[in-house]
Amino acid sequence: MESGGVETTRQGKTESLQYAVGPMAYVYARSNLTIDPEEWGLLCAKSSDQPSTAVAPLIPGLTVEEAFNTSIAAIIATKSSGMVGGAASAILSPCHFSPSVYVFYGGERINATSLAPGLTALCDEARTKFGFSSPPPGGPVSNAKETSGETICAALDMDPETTMLYLVVAEPFCEAVYMCNTFLHFGGADSVYINSEFVRRVPIYPVQMYMPDIALRLCRNPFDTNSRNIGEGCAYPKPLYNKSLNRVLHGAVLAPQGQSLRTRDLEAVARAATAVAFDGNFEGCVLAADKTFTQPATPQAKSAAQKPQADVERRAACSLAADLALTTRVSVSCAPYKFEGNASAPYCQWPMFCDAKTPDERAAALSKFMAELAGIVGAGFFAVNSPLYASEVVDGGAAADPGDKHASSNLTRFFFACGLHTLGCPTVDYAGNRVSDGTGDCALASASGFEYGPEHLAYACGFSPELTARALFYLERCSRYQLGADCRGGANTLKFVAAETTMAAECRWCTETTRQYCVRHTLHRLRSRLPTPRAPRRGPMAVFGAVDAEYTDCDQLGNFAPYSHMKRAGEGDSARNVMNDTYRGLCGRVMQFLVSEGLVRADTGEDARNIQSAKDLCDTYDRISNMVDEECAKFIAALSGARGYHYKEHLASSAHTFAVSLNPYSTSFCPMLSHLVTQTKSIILQDLILSQVPSTFDKGQPETKMFRSAAMPTLRSAFMGMLDKGFVSGRQEPVVVSASSVTAPDTSVPSTEKSVAQYEYSLTRGQVLKLKEFKVKNRIVFNGFEGRRGGVRMQGMADSFSRPASVKHINILGGPLGFLLKRYHEMIFGPENNVFQFWNKVIGGTMPMSHLTPEIRKTLNYIRRVSKAYAESNYVKAQPQTILELANFMVTNKILEYCGHGGTNGSFYISTPSAAVMSATRNKDPSAELAWLPAVANPTTKNLTEAAEKSIASEPEKNWVSTSMVTNACRLVMGTKPIIGLGIMVSKYIGQQSSTTVFQAGNWSGFMGASGIQSVNAGLSGDTTRKCMLACKRTGALIKAGPSSSFTESSLAGQVRSMVEAGCTPHAIYAVALRVLGEGLRDVTTDTWVAIVEDRFLIEALEELHAQIAASTPNGWTHEAAMAELNKHGNEEVATDGEMLNFDCDDDDADKDAPHGAKSDVPNGDDEDVFAGPSAKKRTLATEILFC
């Protein structure tokens, strides 16, 4: 039977969505001999010490049939008519299926996700250490009787030796399965085909179907066959309880919820969630009695009267947010979602497999994509502001006027903070009485001495060995950064492993034979990137999700001149003509021109043409410049004419905008990613809830037990009023069912027999909460006046956005032609010097005139002239890296010129979007190779190094690691429907027309890392003018393409950036890196170079230099050999014979070829244009000056 639902599209139209009425869950039974162990291992989460269980993704064509319905109206109970002899009716609840499936039997053929040993013991220890409850050994209810996997196989007449069983369950009822409130209806078992494989499946229904005369609620004694609640004439079945299944659900479902809700009693979470799932009308508090709180750092008073009021209110806020978040999650899980667009392609049709001919090639393609994804997931573990660590609610202080419950300070009073250092602290109940002593003193006010350990990783993964193994899978594919105090020999993981193995160091989780893969070694390798909690203060929160929308405003000027603000010229003016006159239409014409000229690839935006000569370079730039001038003139004329758009006034309100999808199936292809996205939603929604808590304090006294129940209706109403108010897009949608009756098991017949009955039905929920997306924005134009009155933070932003009043330094290689000059240097100037040496000599005045032909001198003069002109009118702080970026930046600057930006805000750069796009590269780091290296006999440092280097040299097809490259063509990246990670600061403010309406804005912000933002990912920038996100493209991999110890400025990275701007050669930069990193430079990773220099061409030059030094010495790379090679290069004499080119002339038309030292009319004043780099009077630049 089918029933119709209602779904509202983004355009406001309503479309019908058909539901298949059916069971709330299935157990799928299939042969494990037909699965590909390697592919399943790359997709699933499986621990090596739990061979039969795993958490797998919900993927059509892999774990479920291609026609699988993700949204259903599930039968959750029956209800008596109340008349003697009357038939019972069914109760339906709309819901969608969980994005993960749970393998609980027969998973031995699936490869372990990580070879790390002892993850189950680690998770059990961490759970106990941090005070979370463990699965009861006898089951979650009394007298539980297990239904084993062998029993299920026997009932289906399948071989238990070769059968694999896994649970596919509706999202709201995962806890109901855990609480043994369901049963297997073997009589309703059917067959489906998954990728041409015959698979059996057994439907699961709730035991409440046999209890028609009681109110719909959690059944606390489901194994009591003599219960008076069982209906007359019912053949009561055996409830489903499987110990392995419950263990998997405890770690993958319950513990993550307990973590985000700050509730350590996970059995209480299961009971509460089950009760709310069955009772659609419940609006009270279900966790209040079981909630505990971290004890404050200040000593507790002996009596309740002496307890600080602020701490009572903090506990009230923590409890209310958790309760409302739980009921909201259940309500949202009842809303319909489906695979969007091309994302519904079955597994066998994923684009990444289109060129794969063999299973090995398929596994290699899958391994490569997962390595790309590691950059996103890794950020979830490296970021201090990750939702995985937001375990503490902090009170920032009440408003100055207690009576003003809508004061802005009240909206931001409570906020989340990283609580890793408080996990073992003592806990108190709501009254403030200690209930647990914890494992150490509370350090709520200080994180000094904190060290991230394996227990913290297990906590972030819900104490699930499966999810912990999956997390390690991604961390093993993240690069270490040799930047920081521990970058030298002590951080060498190979030595760390060898020393511990030979010394037979005791470890609770590994043995002598498995110590090579121990979790401690992965964390040791990445320890410079692991998070360290900071002093609690309100800041951005890390957000992870997917972009599903076709339309985003992520060009340099965002939603400037949008379609909605354009006037029509008349009735005959088509929508196409109007769109053509928008800023987006302008960007489209620019792109079309570049494609038609053969300069840019239409699908990726990358350069499609090689520069062949100096003349070609000049002609290409002139063509782009002329096109930009013409198109921008037409654009402005249209805006000020027929379109009636006041572009000067609207510039200040323009913003970059896009949306993060809340569809759970956008990220369902990876269990760890689903976990990260689910935690993101929970924390973000609770942040909104916390803003409304202070308004409930006038409903009663927070210290009383009844306060939370009394305040909940007010809080719920206030939270629902925040939907569709700028940040969270969602609404309550009605549930409409059109079927006349439904088919369900006949309760008078044993569940092992095939028998069904027709039931009339009713709905437990008349409407559901459908959340669609988080809206993110970033204002483009910075208002400098706010910086003068906004305190230290705003003043710092003003300093970052500040633009020099006049151009004194022209950075040739960082200017408009820099990327072309670096890429095609040999084609333009010849192979005599590499690009960095050449420009170092030209700018520094050490280039002999005899080495330059008249054509080269003419080209140099042209480059200087256009670079200077660009710099004088440039308001984009980023450097173009492609022809498309160059054209877009030129368009941006031209429009800003028309808008008068130079006159009104000419002293400030604009804010621009960028994306660190994830990619995969072959691993070069021997210490990372340990994770998948076969066990090494006699694991000394030498043997480990030789084995790792041999493995690297062989270039196995699956040993990929994550890397990234930054692009400023953000809208093109958004067009690939990427998985993204970024920081968001949610601002809340009161509406002008209503004092009770709270609007929000999801402001694009950044990550927070232990050693700066680059410890999260090397591609990120700490420059506040550049808003950067992490992005992993789905188009081309999962979705078919459409028709169209310090990272601060005083650190090594800051020093090298200064050298790059000064035009230093790769040898000089390499010398500085060698001084700082020492032996750590031996196995330097690409991501380390990215974090230092950001310039892809310079990175290639540095890696080539590193390889040359290693190849030039008989014993490979050593610190001494590297120093000797650099000294040899540094002693090369600069040519002094003949005249030198003077490239420091201000007059472009006079003295073009004046020799160095010749008399010039250029004044030697402060406003003289000099190029970034050494003075013409200095022949060399000593690296020692960087350490003065």
Curated annotation (Swiss-Prot):
Region (Required for nuclear localization): 1166-1188
GO molecular function annotations of the record: single-stranded DNA binding
Subcellular location: Host nucleus
Gene Ontology terms: cellular component: host cell nucleus
Stretches the record annotates as Disordered: 1145-1175
Gene Ontology annotations of biological process type: DNA replication
UniProt entry keywords in alphabetical sequence: DNA replication, DNA-binding, Host nucleus
Record flagged with keyword Endoplasmic reticulum: no
Sequence motif Required for filament formation, location on chain: 838-839
Subunit structure: Homooligomers. Forms double-helical filaments necessary for the formation of replication compartments within the host nucleus. Interacts with the origin-binding protein. Interacts with the helicase primase complex; this interaction stimulates primer synthesis activity of the helicase-primase complex. Interacts with the DNA polymerase. Interacts with the alkaline exonuclease; this interaction increases its nuclease processivity.
Stated family: Belongs to the herpesviridae major DNA-binding protein family.
HAMAP family for the chain: HSV_DNBI
Role summary: Plays several crucial roles in viral infection. Participates in the opening of the viral DNA origin to initiate replication by interacting with the origin-binding protein. May disrupt loops, hairpins and other secondary structures present on ssDNA to reduce and eliminate pausing of viral DNA polymerase at specific sites during elongation. Promotes viral DNA recombination by performing strand-transfer, characterized by the ability to transfer a DNA strand from a linear duplex to a complementary single-stranded DNA circle. Can also catalyze the renaturation of complementary single strands.
The name this protein goes by in its record: Major DNA-binding protein
Species: Psittacid herpesvirus 1 (isolate Amazon parrot/-/97-0001/1997) (PsHV-1)
